[in-house]
Swiss-Prot record:
A motif (Selectivity filter) lies at residues 580-584. One of its GO terms (cellular component) is apical plasma membrane. The gene is Trpv6. GO terms for biological process: calcium ion homeostasis; calcium ion import; calcium ion import across plasma membrane; calcium ion transmembrane transport; calcium ion transport; parathyroid hormone secretion; protein homotetramerization; response to calcium ion. This is Transient receptor potential cation channel subfamily V member 6. The modification Phosphotyrosine is found at residues 201-202. Residues 1-33 are annotated as: Disordered. The chain crosses the membrane at residues 367-387, 425-447, 463-482, 489-508, 529-551, 596-616. Residues 1-366, 448-462, 509-528, 617-767 are cytoplasmic. CDD domains: TRPV5-6 (cd22192). It comes from Rattus norvegicus (Rat).
Length: 767
């Protein structure tokens, strides 16, 4: 027993001694009382305090979850390197030291299956550092390492094949596949999840890894060895879904085509129609994510060119998954309900733009105008019913000199007697029926979209949905109070009037001039004004308390604005909004601190905070003004989808052409005539001429590099250019002509060559 070992307790090295006992006898750990919680420091706590401590610990863990996750990830990476340096086998695999590996593997005490801090084997490390020779030695000595996955929470399930694929080590991939590596292994660690703090999302299978890094050779190898192109990860995403989410759009389109070339066999459904867990196909996911490149690439597969007549082209576009008719989760509805701004750019793409324009002009705008007119008549009817509500002279005597009430509400038996009352009753019934219809229309959408999405989406008119639902409830509350002869019906009636008339602004979205302004008002109220109210509340609370303390010892008859604390708060609020001036009686002596406090309040409230609010609103106006066309298109789509969903099919026929009548199957199509600019064809011819000149120019440079540039460029045989002038206009024209030439020769700007014509000073080249 060591000198520091407590008597009666086992030493730390006594592995055969059971916990709670000692070699010389039995030692029992003291048990806490049944009605208390045991603290780790050794004393007992009451059960209630133990529960509070447990809840506090859970709250702390929840609050620091993200920071602790990042810190844990950093610590594990450092521990991984430390573990590699401590293990000769892992270090030899990292440094590709084949001789050391052979010696270690021949040693009987060497554990070939030893793992590092991440649960990785030596083969994982060799694959991570692209050490093919070391990996071959390890696979020869222990072939079962090929099937070993990593076991840490971060990289759980990752095999050496995953690492070789993502590093695009083709030779190592071939070696692993030759030794039976599983092509269906799934990497399910937290690093591979689709989360904001993860930099990459490549799915879980080796095939999706290969497709995302753009290795065509590895993709073919994996498919030839039995990789399932229809495999889905934990989110239900196939490899096509995962390609949609990649930032590199160019090779994503190439991999998309390559994978589709392997789709076929006995499957009845195309790989492009396989949905994920959210019910989104790759095409819909491209629209929701705002991936314009992939969306246009997929639309090229869906279009059928009928004929071309000079600059005119007639094209049939397949409306499957785009049109909201007959699809509960169409692309149009997904775009207007998503929170990503990039998705709204899809609304300006063909054929979505043409489909929305057709629906809006043919059905949406007329029905929306009729609906707006009906609502205005309805709210006028409700207003008249409120204005002429049943009142009678007051019967009771006044008991308070401040009470100036002359009329009071009639009882239910007295409210409907005269012909005027009957006319008002008709209007009240119309108001109640309208409120019930509003709730029947709005409540199903709340359950379908969810409360957060339905009331929080500005494009869907979220705040207006809150207004109209609250209005309907206020009307029903007013009805209940009228039927029960309850006093105070003026409260819900007043709220209903304000909310009902404010909802008229919702119908401004039907006009391009007024629609964006409704969004501007929403953003100012729920963005700028809400933040400003927090600052205003702090300032008012501070200065109201100061004013109350200053006038606390004064005569309230002389200085009545601050005689109690609630009145001080209200008076300070009026001062803040400059409704009243300094509410002080200057005929008497005022406290010295009043002048100082009021001067500071005037500077902070009037000069600083009100101008801050104006600046914030101006910034919001500037941002919304730059998006007004895009926002209005989104409003039109949201309104069109809403009307199409609510109206019966007989009032809203399906748009487009049914393919069944023309031998195109059961799909619906939209015919679009497009006129191509002939200047593009001219620019292409110029581009070809310039390309030939560049080839000749490069050949001349190789023959004689000592000649001058003007002598080496044989432009005269092809194009004649004006002699450069020193004037500003000629110099500018020459500069833009050179930009045109450079833009025409770039491979990645075909079709958008005119972007090269923009001048730095805002001048545009005219063709």
């Amino acid at each position: 027993m060591g000198p520091l070992q407590r008597e009666g307790r086992p030493a730390l090295g006594d592995a055969n001694v059971a916990p709670g006992s000692s070699p010389g006898g039995v030692w029992h750990q003291p048990q806490p009382p049944k009605d208390s919680a045991f603290h780790p420091m050794g004393w007992s706590l009451p059960k209630e305090k133990g529960l509070i401590l447990c809840l506090w610990n859970k709250f702390c863990r929840w609050f620091h979850r993200r920071e602790s996750w990042a810190q844990s990830r950093d610590e594990q990476n450092l521990l991984q390197q430390k573990r590699i340096w401590e293990s000769p086998l892992l270090l030899a695999a990292k440094e590709n030291n084949v001789q050391a590996l052979i010696k270690l593997l021949k040693f009987e005490g060497c554990e070939v299956h030893q793992k590092g801090a991440m649960g990785e084997t030596a083969l994982h490390i060799a694959a991570l550092y692209d050490n093919l020779e070391a990996a071959m030695v390890l696979m020869e000595a222990a072939p079962e390492l090929v099937f070993e996955p990593m076991t840490s929470e971060l990289y759980e399930g990752q095999t050496a094949l995953h690492i070789a694929v993502i590093n695009q080590n083709v030779n190592l991939v071939r070696a692993l596949l030759a030794r039976g590596a599983s092509v269906s292994a799934r990497a399910t660690g937290s690093v591979f999840h689709y989360r904001p703090h993860n930099l990459i999302y490549y799915g879980e299978h080796p095939l999706s890894f290969a497709a995302c890094v753009g290795s065509e050779e590895i993709v073919r190898l994996l498919i030839e060895h039995g990789a399932d192109i229809r495999a889905q990860d934990s989110l239900g995403n196939t490899v096509l879904h995962i390609l949609i989410l990649q930032p590199n759009k160019t090779f994503a389109c190439q991999m998309y085509n390559l994978l589709l070339s392997y789709d076929g066999g006995d499957h009845l459904k195309s790989l492009e129609l396989v949905p994920n867990n959210q019910g989104l196909t790759p095409f819909k996911l491209a629209g929701v994510e705002g991936n314009i490149v992939m969306f246009q690439h997929l639309m090229q597969k869906r279009k059928h060119i009928q004929w071309t007549y000079g600059p005119l082209t007639s094209t049939l576009y397949d409306l499957t998954e785009i049109d909201s008719s007959g699809d509960d989760q169409s692309l149009l509805e997904l775009i207007v309900t998503t929170k990503k701004r990039e998705a709204r750019q899809i609304l300006d793409q063909t054929p979505v733009k043409e489909l929305v324009s057709l629906k809006w002009k043919r059905y949406g705008r007329p029905y929306f105008c009729v609906l707006g007119a009906i609502y205005v008549l309805y709210i006028i009817c409700f207003t008249m019913c409120c204005v002429y509500r049943p009142l009678k002279p007051r019967i009771t005597n006044r008991t308070n000199p401040r009470d100036n009430t002359l009329l009071q509400q009639k009882l239910l038996q007295e409210a409907y007697v005269t012909p005027k009352d009957d006319l008002r009753l008709v209007g009240e019934l119309v108001s109640i029926v309208g409120a019930v219809i509003i709730l029947l229309v709005e409540i199903p959408d709340i359950f379908r979209l969810g409360v957060t999405r339905f009331f929080g989406q500005t494009i869907l008119g979220g705040p207006f949905h809150v207004i109209i639902v609250t209005y309907a409830f206020m009307v029903l509350v007013t009805m209940v109070m009228r039927l029960t002869n309850s006093d105070g019906e003026v409260v819900p009636m007043s709220f209903a009037l304000v909310l009902g008339w404010c909802n008229v602004m919702y119908f401004a979205r039907g006009f391009q001039m007024l629609g964006p302004f409704t969004i501007m008002i929403q953003k100012m109220i729920f963005g700028d004004l809400m933040r400003f109210c927090w600052l205003m509340a702090v300032v008012i609370l501070g200065f109201a308390s100061a004013f109350y303390i200053i006038f606390q010892t004064e005569d309230p008859d002389e200085l009545g604005h601050f005689y109690d604390y609630p009145m001080a708060l209200f008076s300070t609020f009026e001062l803040f909004l400059t409704i009243i001036d300094g509410p002080a009686n200057y005929d008497v002596d005022l406290p010295f601190m009043y002048s100082i406090t009021y001067a500071a309040f005037a500077i902070i409230a009037t000069l600083l905070m009100l101008n801050l609010l104006i600046a914030m609103m101006g910034d919001t106006h500037w941002r919304v003004a730059h998006e007004r066309d895009e926002l209005w298109r989104a409003q039109v789509v949201a309104t069109t989808v809403m009307l199409e969903r609510k109206l019966p099919r007989c009032l809203w026929p399906r748009s487009g052409i049914c393919g069944r009548e023309y031998g195109l199957g059961d799909r619906w199509f939209l015919r679009v005539e497009d006129r191509q600019d002939l200047n593009r064809q001219r620019i292409r011819r110029y581009a070809q001429a310039f390309q030939q000149q560049d080839d000749l120019y490069s050949e001349d440079l190789e023959k004689d590099s000592g000649e001058k540039l003007e002598m080496a460029r044989p432009f005269g045989a092809y194009l004649s250019f004006p002699t450069p002038s020193v004037s500003r206009s000629t110099s500018r024209s020459s500069t833009n002509w050179d930009r045109l030439r450079q833009g025409a020769l770039r491979k990645d700007l075909q079709g958008i060559i005119n972007r090269g014509l923009e001048d730095g000073e805002g001048w545009e080249y005219q063709i």
